[in-house]
A protein has these predicted regions:
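Mature-chain termini and adjacent capping regions
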Residues: 1-508
Length: 508
């Protein structure tokens, strides 16, 4: 128990205790329950074990529960289960490990070297297997440190990573609110004097959620279904610990003695609103798998961490030299990718090893710049600083020409509602345009695109990032240059505004 508050922290029990000559105790079916400050329960059980008691005790005292707690020991064929609350009927996550040691004085749990199938396996190669409704995890070697005073995790380390699969990402990550209609607006209450007062605020949480960072290190590969979509040196996920989940009603034993949880005890999706059963269901998202070869480290974030995660906003980062992305025919290379779940915004940033952000799509559009921020809620992508873009343009006789545009002061790209199609682009500052028939300089350039042509039914490639066909070019400011006419004769241009509508005649 916590001596200051009286809160239950830890329970230990075993079906059988056998004293040994060296002062240790062999235990059968030992079980330890950790009571977390957020209401969750961690239960660690094993087939057998050997423990050292914190105080000298007789066998009778041990059997009667008066012999104190083990100070340290070792357990074999261990199962660790995470429950949402003490009365939960089933665990949310289950971890299986062949052998673990524990030390209640230092609150440390770790894998130990063991003989498996006649061979000595080092501690960092003992398999660690985790399964849950939406999660599968495989790695090797475990070191866990517990904060007994605060009732929370201090650190967790998997020595060698292998695989993490999230079968349904929408049930694990918080739901985004990128659509304005889904944003939460504080309720306002009218007072008697006609003024409007803000809604009353909830009472402070006496069990605040802890912000953690999970760091997957070395040779990171991300797959969506069977398709590889990203590679990086490191994957970082900033998130909050789970909120307290209270049971709606106490569980009642049935005549057989088994615990029956009330229907409301079944864990619901914590991030997705419950919809009527008649509501149309979207196709299930593909599972996401992360593979890596180095360590997985989980630890609390520093209190002064800038832009920390919130309950609705987890932060996912890919860091590499460089980070490479590929999906639906589109590719990107950058030094760092930052994704925020609340608004589904994406930032592609440079690094010392990858100073330029490069993007290409399956339709021939390419972009080079120093930084890109995609804001799905506003339907725009902002390219910072100077850059270069290349766009396919319809040419004579059905051929495709390339228009190259350079700029100095940034570019704003307009996206379709689903963020998959480029509809427009505005280039600012010392803009230059180069095309087989056009050579121009301007202060600003606006480009408008036709929607991409529909693909045949057999072509399942997604339109993500497609720019369609350039329909109009509008140059403003100090516009100068030349344009070739149909006879390839140059015509000099000097104006404040120039608009070119691009298309083909019936002859192509």
């Amino acid at each position: 128990y916590d001596r200051a508050t009286g809160r239950l922290l830890l329970e230990f029990g075993s079906e059988r205790y056998e004293p040994q000559r060296d002062g240790t105790w062999d235990v059968t079916r030992p079980s330890v329950r950790f009571h977390l400050s957020d209401g969750n329960i961690i239960r660690m059980s094993a087939d057998t074990g050997r423990v050292i008691m914190s105080t000298a005790a007789t066998e009778r005292q041990i059997a009667s529960g008066q012999g104190g707690m083990p100070s340290r020991g070792e357990m074999r064929e261990v199962t660790i289960e995470l429950f949402d609350h003490p009365d939960a009927a089933a665990p949310r996550l289950t971890c299986n490990v062949p052998i673990l040691s524990f030390d209640n004085d230092t609150y440390r749990i770790a894998t130990e070297a063991a003989v498996v199938d006649g061979k000595l396996v080092p501690a960092d190669r003992i398999p660690v297997r985790v399964r849950g409704e939406d999660v599968e995890f495989d790695g090797y070697g475990l070191v866990l440190r517990w904060n007994g005073l605060d009732g929370r995790l201090d650190s967790l380390e998997i020595i060698h990573g292998e695989r993490l699969t999230i079968r349904n990402p929408s049930r694990v990550l918080p739901e985004s609110d990128s659509a304005a209609s889904r944003r939460v607006v504080p309720a306002m209450y009218a007072q008697a004097d006609g003024h409007v007062a803000p809604a009353p605020q909830p009472a402070p949480d006496d069990n605040p959620r802890v912000a953690y960072r999970a760091a997957f290190e070395q040779d990171v590969v991300v797959l969506e279904g069977d398709a590889q979509v990203a590679t990086a040196t490191q994957l970082l996920v900033d998130l909050l610990s789970e909120a307290r989940v209270e049971p709606a009603a106490a569980a009642e034993p049935d005549p057989t003695g088994d615990v029956i949880a009330p229907p409301s005890d079944r864990r619901r999706d914590r991030t997705t609103p419950v919809e009527p059963e008649t509501a149309p269901q979207d196709a299930a998202p593909l599972p996401v798998t992360v593979r890596w070869t180095g360590k997985l480290r989980v630890a609390p974030l520093a209190a002064d961490q800038p832009a920390p995660p919130t309950a609705d906003d987890y932060i996912v980062q890919l860091v590499g030299s460089p980070v490479s992305l590929a999906r639906d025919g589109a590719e990107a290379v950058c030094g760092r990718l930052v994704y925020r779940t609340a608004d589904e915004s994406i930032a592609l940033e440079p690094s010392a090893d990858a100073p330029i952000v490069e993007l290409t799509d399956a339709d021939g559009v390419s972009l080079r710049t120093t930084r890109v921020i995609v804001d799905r809620s506003k339907g725009i992508a902002t390219l910072d600083g100077n850059g270069r873009a290349k766009f396919p343009v319809r040419g004579d006789d059905g051929r495709t020409d390339l228009l190259t545009a350079d700029w100095r002061d940034g570019c704003v790209v307009g996206l379709s509602d689903d963020g998959r199609v480029v509809q427009s682009a505005t280039l600012n500052g010392a803009v230059s345009i180069l095309h087989p028939r056009v050579n121009l300089a301007a202060d600003q350039l606006d480009l408008a695109f036709d929607p991409p042509a529909e693909k045949p039914a057999a072509d399942h490639r997604d339109e993500r990032g497609a720019a369609g066909t350039l329909r109009q070019l509008r140059a403003t400011g100090s516009v100068s240059g030349n344009i070739l006419d149909d006879e390839a004769r140059p015509a000099a241009i000097a104006s404040r505004v120039l608009v070119l509508d691009i298309g083909t005649d019936p002859a192509g």
